[in-house]
Every structure is written in C-alpha cells, then in structure tokens.
C-alpha cells in the first residue's frame, strides 16, 4: 500500500495491472489516492485486507476502483472478499470493480447477487471511477 495525493482508491492484483490503471486514471483526468497491489496468489482474506487497508489508509476517497485480472487468482474468491468486507463495513462511496480471468462468471454472479456492479471493460471502469470521484452520477 502506497498513499498518493488523489481521491480514487485503487486495488489491483498485480503491479503491471496497477501501473496501467494508474496511467489510465490520470489520462482520464483523475488522481489515485493510493497504489494497493495484492501481488501473488490471493484469497478472500487478502482481498478483504486490501479493502481494509485502503479504507483505513487515507481519508477523502471518493470512489474505489478494484481491477482484478486473474490467471492464478480466482475471481469468485476475490468477489467473496469484497462482498464480505462491504457487509461488515458498509461504505458510502461508489465501488467500481473489473473482474477478468479464472472463475470470472462465478465472481460476477457473487457481485451481482450482492447488488454490486461489475465492469467488463477496463477503460469504462476507470472512466466511471473518475466520474464518480468528480461527483458525477
């Protein structure tokens, strides 16, 4: 976890994915509040802890962007961690989640059943996170 100056929280499951997403956030007029990269094999607990780290790390986050592209990591487990965190710690900011990879459909189902949006396209996800942070609906 590295705190930054902006207002868009960012969680990614790899350094490359995170760096690309940081660039896209800036290219679209936003500023990231952090760089939280989970790296390596993850689990629902690791995802939960990443959410906890971001929300306890810096005040003033206006949207949270979670970008997960899993080969080894299972998207259903990542979704379980996100949903569990939000059930235990409701947040009032928009959440933007992009899931792609192993067990993707199962992960999307878990998110949708919890009433949480899931994005198929990284650029659309980033654009919405930037728009939400700027106060857009």
Question: What is the meaning of each model-derived region?
Answer:
Residues 1-63, 100-137:
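ATP-dependent carboxylate/acyl-activation modules
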Residues 60-101:
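C-terminal hydrophobic structural anchor segments
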